[in-house]
Amino acid sequence: IIQTDENNYRTLGSYLECLQNEQAFPWGKEAVVETPHIDRLAHQGVLFTRCYATSPVSSPSLASFMSGLYSKNNVVWTNEMVLSDAAVTFGESLRQNGYATGYIGKLHLNGKGRPEWHPRRDFGFSDNRYMYNRGHWKKIEETAEGPTFRTDADVKSTDEQTFPTDYFTTQAIEFINRHKEGPFCCMLCFPDPHSANLVRPPYDTMYSRIRFKEPATALTDTTGRPAWSHGNNLKADQHEDMAQYFGMIKCIDDNVGRILDALKGAGILDNTIIIFTSDHGDMCRQHGLINKGVPLDDSSRVPFIISYPAGMRQGIRIENVMSVTDFTPSLLSFCNIRPTTQYDGRDLSLLWKGEKLPEKYKDIVFMRAITPKIKSDWDESTTAMRTKWISAVTPEYKLTYSEYASDVPWLTDLKKDPDELVNCYRDPAYKEIVSRLAADLKEYGEQYNDPRIKHPKIQQEILSAILKK
């Protein structure tokens, strides 16, 4: 399982193939990263065109991915929180069923420790020597006590032995070779392409020739738009940041190639389930924004590719929406492992196999903004943040409500308006759609006890939408 951090899906060739020209090349037609190894996984397996983070920030998204639970039940609703002891990770379930389990790279589920190598709690991964909690430094060195980050190192002094993406890949390959004779699960979490946008030579100059254009969405008037869509600290010149970001993506893809070569060399490539995904996206200047945390697709929509040549059809694109919360129950079902706990996420393993879901299946996912203060319980009453939003997403529509006083509810027709610029909420033609999605949000909030649905403003807007049906 290969997971990146803050990976815009438009940087992967296999996702560009799913998009129309104006959507595929927001930074200009020459602004393309070559990702042949990740694309190979997509062409030999299944690609979900619309997989979403339950909350587009590292810890909450990864917690839901690992546990199959929404934030209310895994108690990780912002960064620097600890995954609930009651949460049974997919790693623990696989370990209990005879798999050798290992975790390599960034965890971000064990509180404030930084970097905190091989934490005492292993989260279901027996080999966690190369697991660390959090941080984005650019050089790793081996010591007698184990790996350590050189926090003062210049990225230009790193190489294929010390740059984190390469280093963690080397450890993953060693894990594969040690356990190739039996069932294993290796979770490899790259800390890139998260900011700061810096990558080692020669990747640091590979894309310097490109003149990145400002995305069209960054040039639009934000008057009347919700607070969560307003710009945030953009540099005047994006060129260097984007060139470095593309370089990080290229470095990741080359290391995915190393992993595929290692699996082939071990004779187990065709019989290994390989998953490529990310915890959340990066706005990359779309809508005049950088980083993540908002419901817009460049922030909340993540790549999700699964390849298993011996056990699934190839070259399949899935248009159904998927949530990272669906991952754990789907993986265990796909591996024929009976769960030992109740999950909030759904079993989508039929889609992984290229089969259809039952007719009664409701094709919808839910997302929410983080809760910005760490508290001992789920009380949000005293926190204030302009981005306290909640969304329902289907393949066709996205409905978002916000606690912020001046924010109007926002409905996007994703098919007609993939740039997410036009609000259809008060358009009479969408009245039935608004009412249905509002009812779905209400049902979700009540079933999973999400307090954001109970906020007076959001509650009133949802009830009003339902009554107008």
State what each model feature region is.
Residues 1-403, 407-410, 418-439, 443-446, ...:
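Formylglycine-dependent sulfatase
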Residues 415:
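Residues forming the ATP-binding cleft of Hanks-type serine/threonine protein kinase domains
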Residues 455-456:
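A short glycine-rich, hydrophobically flanked beta-strand micro-motif that places a catalytic Asp/Glu
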